[in-house]
Swiss-Prot record:
SUPFAM superfamilies in alphabetical order: UROD/MetE-like
Key words, A-Z: Amino-acid biosynthesis, Metal-binding, Methionine biosynthesis, Methyltransferase, Repeat, Transferase, Zinc
Reactions the enzyme catalyzes: 5-methyltetrahydropteroyltri-L-glutamate + L-homocysteine = tetrahydropteroyltri-L-glutamate + L-methionine
Enzyme class name: transferase
BP GO annotations: methionine biosynthetic process; methylation
Protein name, as recorded: 5-methyltetrahydropteroyltriglutamate--homocysteine methyltransferase
Residues reported to bind L-methionine: 425-427, 478, 593
Highest taxon of the lineage: Bacteria
Length: 749
């Protein structure tokens, strides 16, 4: 039996790629130095996979920014505005992901969306009327050659043509079918070039096949692959799926002339049932049996029981998806062995795949025995008081009174805000000084008194600055917080925190998800100190800033021994206690961020409510259901597809919601109007994920577009996300323009 993985993390064991790339962005190193460092990192990663005994090693799973963007660049799906920039290929590539503002021009970044139900974000290409799809890049060939020079005949990985078309945007007047022939020709050119270089197999990632597919989408898939596979140029083709099962196309899929198919046996509800119904003897089945999205040890007995039921003659063991969704290795962690033994990060998952292969081949008895022992006893006990509190919840605990319309009138009278009130999402830039002071405090080099004095001074500066430019609702800036989930988790029982458990989120940005180890309760007030301090420094309202229970759950590595619903309700009660303490301390506007609400929405619509929304939305309502009617509840949501769950979002019963919608051209506005959305809304008037400052008139035009779709009394003016990662000069310049644009728009009402 052979072993492989779908893909490997890119940032490096210690986020080397992130830090090197950021040096390049700051012009501290050259393009050549960046490319050389990336080449060294790839070699290191391939060597790790090889030394762990994995027999089939992927290549081109590495990316300087995003693998979907890589595919767009490879196939020339690049807007003319970027094509025409007098920049190097690498500079144009980064301009697509980050935007560009300089002497050569000014272009906005492409939109960014969540990658299925993960916290990874992909860059969304756009097919335009004049898009000429052709083979234009060489990264996939360069990296195959690099590996070959190291003595490795790798399996290049590429986004499949169906998923590429399904997840891209299209200019009005063009559609996916228009590009089938040119895209197939470009893929076949890739096949031919790889075959020339000595490749024997290519992996085409078709995650879009695990979603609900219409008849038209199935027809598109079959049209693409019937044409593509008519001439494979001598390559074997592995069609790889993940994040679910392929029930809609299984019968068609197994009859295609592909050589191998990869299935997800972790998240694929019906995968085992499908393959037990029959799998062709002339194809190889890649069994994704080791979870690529969570960090818990694999239960070998359970995995072996699944594998024994697979009727395929030729099986390759693999991960359920790319390992980029988990941290690099547990080797650098400082947990006690009794805790650490329960975790497997990317490198350790290589061991698990190898172990399972060995056990199936009659070896690995010691590994199996050790694994059995690990799962023989309960890992953690229960909090009986918490379980009783949850059991005692009734419908009234999830209902806020009075109803929204009455609260809206009460709050209008209480706050007396102008039309189109201005605010920010919460965080301000975390400078080197802010991070250095936090680190010094954590190391004991700065006393509590000294650290508090620094935070108070920083908050004072930003409160005064917000007053000076005439913001309406202020924020304290979150300078005391390292991360919007970790900061809360550190004040909750049941949480563990890795030292180096970084996972790529978008571009070079990493997040360090905490681990939910046991039952979750609040240990002490978390945000009251600094929120109430900030409110004491101004007569204007200052928002209290909390992370919501669904987002805390979704941006953590969840337990597998209880349901995510039960874990979320535990977190909801902890955050509810914090909301009530903030209210009692005089904080009358409280933002409960649900940035990741959409993230764990099942990929199939039939599962949306029963498996997720029926408990996720009530969990949010539980948090704020008992606040007074004159306390205003805000929430915020990050890049995602929201249009299909607008009624559920309205049902959260917040008073104000802000979306990250500016980068996607405010597409959500039409749906808000169509669904008669009642909650007040701040769609975001500029994109903070790009370092560019919005041009004169740009924010004015965005506000005008918003007001064309949403009644002015319902509209808030804000950036599309927090400003933690931005620089101070660009932040201040952008926010001054925002306030000026809001005032100008008020005069036109």
């Amino acid at each position: 039996m052979s072993t492989t993985i779908v893909g490997f993390p890119r940032l490096g064991e210690f986020r080397e790629l992130k830090f090197t790339t950021e040096k390049y962005f700051r012009k501290e190193i050259s393009e050549e130095e960046l490319l050389a460092a990336a080449k060294d990192l790839r070699a290191k990663h391939w060597n790790i996979v090889k030394e762990k005994g994995i027999t089939e090693i992927p290549s081109n799973d590495f990316s300087h920014y995003d693998n979907f963007l890589d595919a767009a660049f490879l196939f020339n799906v690049v807007p003319a505005s970027v094509q025409n920039l007098d920049l190097s290929d690498l500079e144009r590539y980064f301009a697509l992901g980050r935007g560009y503002q300089g002497e050569k021009g000014d272009v906005r970044a492409l939109p960014m969306k969540k990658w299925f139900n993960t916290n990874y974000h992909y860059i969304v290409p756009k097919f335009e009327k004049d898009t000429q799809v052709k083979l234009a890049g060489h990264k996939i060939f360069d990296e195959f050659q690099e590996a070959k020079e190291l003595g490795l005949n790798t399996r290049p990985v590429l986004v499949g043509p169906f998923t590429f078309l399904q997840l891209s945007d299209f200019e009005e007047g063009v559609k996916a079918d228009d590009f089938v022939d040119s895209l197939v020709a470009a893929y076949q050119e890739v096949f031919a070039k790889l075959a020339e270089l000595g490749a024997t197999c290519i992996q085409l990632d078709e995650a879009a096949l695990v979603k609900d597919l219409t008849a038209e989408e199935k027809a598109l898939f079959l049209n693409l692959y019937n044409k593509l596979l008519a001439d494979k140029k001598g390559l074997e083709v592995l069609l790889q799926t993940y994040f679910g099962d392929v029930r809609d196309v299984y019968a068609d899929l197994v009859n295609l002339p592909v050589d191998a198919i990869g299935f997800d046996f972790v998240e694929g509800k019906k995968t085992l049932e499908l393959v037990k119904g029959g799998f062709p003897a002339d194809k190889t089945l890649y069994a994704g049996i080791v979870n690529g999205k969570n960090i818990w040890r694999n239960n070998y007995e359970k995995s072996l029981a699944v594998l024994e039921q697979i009727p395929a003659e030729n099986i390759v063991l693999t991960s359920s998806c790319s390992l980029l969704h988990v941290p690099f290795t547990t080797a650098n962690e400082e947990f006690e062995p009794a805790l650490l033994n329960h975790f497997a990060f990317a490198v350790e998952k290589l061991d698990e795949i190898r172990d399972l292969d060995a056990i199936r081949n009659g070896q690995g008895s010691e590994a199996l025995a050790a694994n059995k022992e690990l799962f023989a006893t309960e890992r953690v006990g229960e909090n009986a008081e918490l379980r009783a509190r949850i059991a005692g919840l009734t419908d009234t605990d999830y209902t806020r009174l009075p109803a929204f319309a009455e609260r809206e009138a009460i709050q209008e009278e209480a706050f007396k805000l102008p039309a189109l009130p201005t605010t920010t999402i919460g965080s301000f830039p975390q400078t080197k000084e802010v991070r250095a002071k936090r680190l010094a405090y954590r190391k004991g080099e700065l006393s509590q008194k000294e650290y508090d004095a620094f935070l108070a001074e920083t908050i004072d500066e930003w409160i005064k600055w917000q007053e000076d430019i005439d913001f309406d609702v202020l924020v304290h800036g979150e300078f005391e917080r390292n991360d919007m989930v970790e900061y809360f988790g550190q004040n909750l029982s049941g949480y563990l925190f890795s030292k180096n458990g970084w996972v790529q989120s978008y571009g070079m940005r990493g997040v360090k998800p905490p681990i939910i180890w046991g039952d979750v309760t609040r240990l002490n007030p978390i945000t009251v100190k600094w929120s109430s301090y900030a409110q004491s420094r101004t007569n204007k309202p200052v928002k209290g800033m909390l992370t919501g229970p669904v987002t805390i759950l979704n941006w953590s590595f969840p337990r597998e021994d209880i349901s995510i619903k039960d874990s979320t309700l535990q977190i909801a009660l902890a955050i509810k206690d914090e909301v009530l303490d903030l209210e009692a301390a005089g904080v009358k506007i409280i933002q409960i961020d649900e940035a990741a609400l959409r993230e764990k929405l099942p990929l199939r619509r039939s599962d949306w409510y029963e498996d997720y929304l029926d408990w996720a939305i009530p969990a949010f309502r539980l948090v704020h259901s008992t606040v007074a009617p004159d306390t205003q509840i805000h929430t915020h949501m990050c890049y995602s597809e929201f249009t299909d769950i607008i009624p559920a979002i309205d049902n959260m019963d917040a008073d104000v919601i802000s979306f990250e919608a500016s980068r996607s051209n405010l597409e959500i506005l039409d749906e808000l109007k169509a669904k008669n959305f009642q909650t007040e809304v701040g769609p975001g008037v500029y994109d903070i994920h790009s370092p560019r400052v919005p041009n004169e008139g740009e924010i004015d035009n965005t506000i005008e577009a918003i007001l064309a779709k949403v009644p002015s009394k319902k509209v808030w003016i804000n950036p599309d996300c927090g400003l933690k990662t931005r620089g101070i000069p660009e932040t201040k310049e952008s926010l001054i323009r925002l306030v000026e644009a809001a005032k100008a728009a008020r005069e036109k009402l």
